[in-house]
Amino acid sequence: MSTKPKFNTLTVLVVGLWIFGTGDAVIIAAGLGVAPWTVLAQGIGIQFNWTIGQATFFISVIVLFLWIPLKEKPGVGTILNAILIAAAIDVMEPYLPHPEQQIYQLIQVLLGTILVGIGSGFYLTANLGPGPRDGWMTGLQRITNIPIGRVRTTIEIIALLIGWKLGGVFGVGTIIFAILIGPVVALFLQLTDRIWGIN
């Protein structure tokens, strides 16, 4: 992993992370339920009177500390992931529509999921380090030899349940995101890799 990335690679990373955070904000504004980690951020935000972006950044910092016993090493992308996604959520969410009709809420959740997929494709193609949560999951997988899918599912269910108990919003949007995000990320990762060929 390069610690001195090329300008175009860094640009792809930054743009991707901002798109990712904007996608999160679009889903939040829909009001129909959010991604598991965002449910946790909402819950923490409610308890401490923080914005969702502030709570998201807090979670990222805590998770990075959990890298230490796993001997994972953050990259440029790891640090920027923690900062930019949280910033994008707080900057973009107030300017987004907050629909009341369910059909428009569903459309907004789908749009947000697509944006998260596009953003993921960008930042993963840049290959400058995993996000805090992804690095923690892969580190746990390496240490425990438990399949990554099972590790990811277990952690996200725990994050979801804690967030829900703290007041985060679990709903149809959460289920839609959980079902679609894998295929959407895979699609846009393939497309961005073809376009930029950074990897």
List PLM regions with ranges:
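Core subunits and conserved enzymes of cellular information-processing
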Residues: 1-199
